[in-house]
């Protein structure tokens, strides 16, 4: 029987792995992969871009670089990425299967929960968190966290916290926040037990020794991730540390750390998803008291993650209010606090909670209604309800929220069936489900014809939960399949296919026609230069050093190279590199090339209307005549000879 269960678990993990491939597949390199993979290769081979300022900066994910980078001794970069993706997605599949089975021990249901989880985290995150993606430190941390939580909800605390310690070693924030949320869940459980004990209820848990052993062992293991992170500010003055924190939070990573800077749709969709999770918190699964206790521990874990996010919201919104009220003199302290990614935990726990809760509720409602999900009564009873849920989704999206947004934005109303999932579609669906769910819960409480109302409410709840558990994930998987079957451009390249091809052409030219020691300046947001051209670059917006001193120097360099010094605020970063070069003029650019030892500059071709601006056209022609060595339809390469600049 044990072997049978293991084979079933392996088959479920294989199916989840297929879903992970569907959501995670993108051409190499994906977002952040040049960053993490480059660091990992450089860890074992210091000669790999030895002159690159980012790769030679301090390492914050030491264990990940040490373990993953070891395979770079045998594999080329592209093969290394595919090996890493396959390993991470496979480990994640097994980890999720363990967590799902710990809460919902039904054959095959971990596949349904995985499909729902991948869908909800893809479309309803607040601050950009993901679980299935490219090769980086948090990707390998999540499987250990999931596995640890599977043990945690079963009260096997020694193994749980050891696994969470391993997760922390690979990524201190992913694992560390998980440990704190687990401890918060235990604290809530202890408070509940104390209240029940005082009322003559249950005794103490008797798991203290096991818990301490797990925390001690996991804490020691986590030092592999914690100590490098703590060392990042070492040697920097308090002023430099604070400046680095401000740069990191408000200038570079605000889209992950500062919700007030995000589009309002991000906040609305996450709020709606949180309300859906609260809706499923009322659900009590069938089974033993032990099974219900596991769900309580999981729900408390999610609740603590939301409390953590609430603290982050206070640092973001509350501190400015305190300053305005005169209760706080320095509002910049928020940067020192927000840098700890307060929304990273809830960004995945709430989607996971909805995925697990909706699937469990749908299964229980099916049993209570007298039909099995895979039984004979499924097709005549459950499928029409799911179809109705899909119709509600389309109607709500078309007639209500999408129309309101179109009016507000003075845009055309989107079509009935969108070509790809969009935040508006997802928000509309959740809003519709919430409205119907609240209505049917209210109907259930009305006295009178109890049997008819009970049948109606059960059918409606089955429709709501089935739509959440099956219709939405299936829709997302279908749209993802359609998108991935088309022409894909690496997300680290320029987004448009023609521009991406031009980018690859200029990268190939650089690799074939410049020395390996050459240093380039390239457009600010193009992160795949080193990957394709195999040449170093002086700076990159994506590749922000992690130690405080290097971060401050990096930011000053970015300001000097990528802004004109005229514009202020965030808009100063909006100009393409060619516009910055034309604003500075050839002599100033040459001086900067000499100062920073830049051999080549890769810039976008100027816009077609440059001919209507004589002075700008004159500057461009002068620059091209003196420095151009290559160009294609989209990019131009300028070469600077440093020896000719002495004395300027």
Predicted regions and their residues:
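Transmembrane catalytic cores of multi-pass membrane glycosyltransferases
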Residues: 20-37, 44-45, 49, 53-61, ...
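Short hydrophobic/aromatic helix or loop-helix immediately within or flanking a transmembrane segment
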Residues: 37-39, 54-77, 167
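Loop-to-helix entry region of an early transmembrane alpha helix in multi-pass inner-membrane enzymes
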Residues: 52, 74-94
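Transmembrane-helix signature of polytopic, membrane-embedded enzymes
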Residues: 96-124
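Membrane-interface transmembrane helices that cradle and orient dolichyl/undecaprenyl
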Residues: 140-159, 186, 192-196
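Membrane-interface alpha helices of multi-pass inner-membrane proteins
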Residues: 149-151, 158-175, 183, 216-220, ...
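Transmembrane helical bundles and short interhelical boundary loops of multi-pass, membrane-embedded
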Residues: 304, 308, 312-342, 349-352, ...
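Short periplasmic/luminal acceptor-recognition loop of GT-C membrane glycosyltransferases, typified by
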Residues: 470-486, 496-579, 586, 590-610
